[in-house]
Amino acid sequence: MTLGEMCSVQRGKRLTKRDLNHNGRYPVFHGGIEPIGYYSSSNREANSVMVINVGASAGTVGYSSKEFWSSDGCFCFSHCEQLNQKYLFYALQSMENSIKGQVRKAGIPTLDNKVVEKLKIPIPSLAEQQRIVSILDKFEALTTSISEGLPKEIELRRKQYEYYRNQLLSFAQPLPKT
């Protein structure tokens, strides 16, 4: 079954720089998986998948656990009963290189919505989708933990090494002869 048969692929709505504000509640995504600013309302519900469709990041797959504003630089997908959005995220992420390979590179890189609609996504039962998501979420947490925790552990070991080195090399000063 293709992605376009399962759910509708929706392009976000354009905002101008004047529309963005620092006090806005909802992040705005356009041409990248990092927000370009904030806006006072959202047009996508929490736990939604996005695929960047324009610019250097075209074809990149993203996921937001919070409501957000999807600009016209992103494709998003309607939520449907037979498809767990986090499962869709992981499935599309596994196809990301293939998706990026179909980006038109002339001028400004662009991904056509037909490419995304024609993607074939295996759809197991919702229970199986949830099981897969649970496993992949654990791996994601472990990877994040390693990339954040390992530098901290290295720093602590370096300090421990310096402490013991200094202890070993701080010989007691001989008492002056009287």
Placement of each model-derived feature along the sequence:
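Charged, alpha-helix-forming regions
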Residues: 1-178
